[in-house]
Amino acid sequence: MKSASLIIISILTITGCCPVFFQPANPGVDYRWAIERWQQKVQAEGWGEPLIDEITSSCLRLAKYEQEHGDDNWKTYHEFLKDFKGDCEDISVFMYGTLKRLGYPKALRLRIIRMPMGDHAVLMVELPKGEWKMFNSTSMPLDFADIAVSRTIVEWDDDNIYYPR
């Protein structure tokens, strides 16, 4: 029986099908490494839309979307870093906190939009040239038809709350 187990383990290891190869990376380790790399890029190249896109898309890859049931409790940036799990507002806060941690010099806002599918949180970033860009907090693309009929409920930053007129 021992020899059969050894043969199976050997085959799995040789073929690359060993479960150890499928273990997900620790998002905390990946995140710390990414922060260091982004800091180097900011120092070398400065801020630009491609770097902001890279940072936000990397945050989405590190985050695991988990729909909350019952009361909707928002995680802080530091709470999110404990397990990298949350729903749309937690992931938006994570992206916001990441850009703040990196010293992003332009305005950042969290925005709640009302859409046909329900309320949704996104990150708004003032780009280096002054225009605003919305970053979705889930990997599922927003339908343009839904965006067209959506409306902002509220948005805010560290200092102010903005209501639509």
Model-based region annotation:
Residues 4-14:
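Sec-dependent N-terminal signal peptides
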Residues 16-165:
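A structural boundary/capping signal
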